Amino acid sequence: YDLVVVGGGPAGSSAAFAAAKNGIKVALIEKENNIAETVRTSGVTWIESIKEFGIPNDCYNPIKNFSFVSPNNQVTISDSVATAAVLDVRKTYQWLANEAEKIGVDIFVKTNINAVIKNEQNDIVGVSGIGVNGKIIFHAKVIIDATGFTSTISKAMGFVTQWKRFGAGAEYEAKVENVDSETWWLMVGQEYTPAGYAWIFPLGNNIVRIGVGVGKPESDIDPTQRL
């Protein structure tokens, strides 16, 4: 392959799709049973980026109003035209992967990459791991580590040892009545969460994502306690 992308989340699927559109031979590798089986993001992004990839309108909810809330104040900033959106994350990632596959990307699920392959000059020339039929090896000119927080490839390369600062979050997806589908809310302050923030992001059709994020190691609070 010209390019091997490890991780089928937003970065990995987007990279594979963009590369394949430019004629690059790509393998996209995901350790779970399916692309987007587990979602670890609330899916807020810019409409400009959505349009760049041609993501269908039914994959996102446009946002015009941004409300920032603290214990003593609230400010809302509004756009006349929506510039941000909340993605249907699973639907979007699966769409990206399907489109990538249509233009020649080889997708390998249930494949856990756990090592890098180096040549005599100590250059990275591939990765290896365990697939559905046992050990599997991929050789490539370029490797992209899109494994997120786990940083599987970066750790194997020695680029990352352990994250010293990171965020931990928890989120519910719920159906509520009379929600403003064009407004998201961001809450800060000890009343909501220490060393972090809370949020309410609407997906449309009276569905919202309600979540809390906490900075580590600044706080040892379990974010689920603040939901």
Residue ranges, per PLM feature:
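N-terminal Rossmann-fold NAD(P) dinucleotide-binding loop
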Residues: 12-13
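Predominantly flavin-linked oxidoreductase catalytic cores and closely associated redox partners
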Residues: 22, 99-227
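Short, histidine-centered active-site or binding-site loop motifs used for metal coordination
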Residues: 30-33, 81, 212-216
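Phosphate-coordination loops involved in phosphoryl transfer and adenosine-cofactor binding
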Residues: 1-2, 110
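A conserved beta-strand/loop capping segment in the N-terminal third of enzymes
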Residues: 45-97, 110
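Generic structural signal for well-ordered, non-membrane alpha-helical segments
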Residues: 38, 42, 46, 85, ...
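Glycine-rich FAD pyrophosphate-binding loop
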Residues: 4, 8, 17-40
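Structural motif
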Residues: 2-3, 142
